């Protein structure tokens, strides 16, 4: 729920200069609804694969973002694999920990924050909604709407 609560915490908060929602899940009140009122630059990271638990709709959150937003889908990444309890998962033998996608996510987050908060042009691509990278899919416009499950009325 951390990604969704980051969005809720940024709502009407003048101290917030950037928001990162990593694998945001469903929240109450709705982070998707709150995103419609956030002008702060945002980074929303979702999975490049279907989640069997349907924890949330990161693409819909990004689609509803009022201000500038970057949506990134990480290949083979998921909410379940992005965890800090790596040692426990390794000790009990679960294969849920995803070191590659986790490192990609950390890199995207760091670059986005450096570009946005430090206004560092070296990292400008990390804040570009259409930037591409290996094992990362960036979606905007109609592609983002399709991933979000949003359709226009005919």
Which residues make up each language-model segment?
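Gly/Ala-rich beta-loop-alpha elbow adjacent to hydrolase catalytic centers
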Residues: 1-6
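Alpha/beta-hydrolase-fold serine-hydrolase catalytic core, especially in secreted/extracellular enzymes
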Residues: 76, 85-154
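The feature captures the conserved acid-bearing segment of alpha/beta-hydrolase catalytic domains
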Residues: 17-84
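Sec/Tat-exported extracytoplasmic proteins
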Residues: 14, 23, 116-117
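Conserved hydrolase catalytic core segment
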Residues: 8-17
């Amino acid at each position: 729920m951390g990604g969704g609560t980051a969005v809720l915490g940024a709502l009407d908060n003048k101290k917030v200069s950037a928001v990162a929602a990593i694998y945001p899940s469903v929240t109450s009140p709705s982070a998707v609804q709150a995103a419609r009122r956030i002008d702060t630059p945002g980074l929303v990271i979702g999975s490049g694969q279907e989640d069997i638990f349907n924890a949330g709709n990161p693409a819909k959150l990004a689609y509803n973002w009022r201000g500038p937003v970057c949506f990134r889908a990480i290949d083979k990444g998921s909410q379940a694999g992005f965890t800090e309890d790596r040692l426990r998962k390794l000790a009990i033998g679960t294969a849920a920990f995803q070191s590659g996608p986790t490192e990609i996510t950390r890199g995207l987050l760091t670059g986005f924050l450096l570009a946005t908060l430090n206004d560092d042009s070296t990292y400008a691509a990390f804040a570009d909604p259409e930037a591409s990278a290996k094992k990362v899919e960036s979606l905007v416009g109609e592609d983002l709407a399709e991933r979000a499950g949003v359709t226009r009325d005919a």
